[in-house]
Amino acid sequence: NNKKFKIWIQIAAFSNIKSAKILQDKFKEIQNINVHKVFLKGRNIYRVRVGPFLSIDKADSVYNFLIAKGMQGTKFIVE
């Protein structure tokens, strides 16, 4: 299998775009922070994610920064 995986950090997910954009703006100093819209269980979900990262070291650094800022729900996503 030659599939390349991408590493993302998901900070949070919201049912409304406004909340997602507020969080995105709060952490605008982080490069590559975006809101990703997905349709799940009959509704739109807005995921605030950072990435993709080229290295696990960089992802770890951003993850630790977010945890230190109180974002305890932050998690790694590998796709």
Each model region followed by its residue ranges:
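Extracytoplasmic
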Residues: N2-F5, S15-E79
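Conserved beta3-strand ATP-binding lysine motif
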Residues: A12
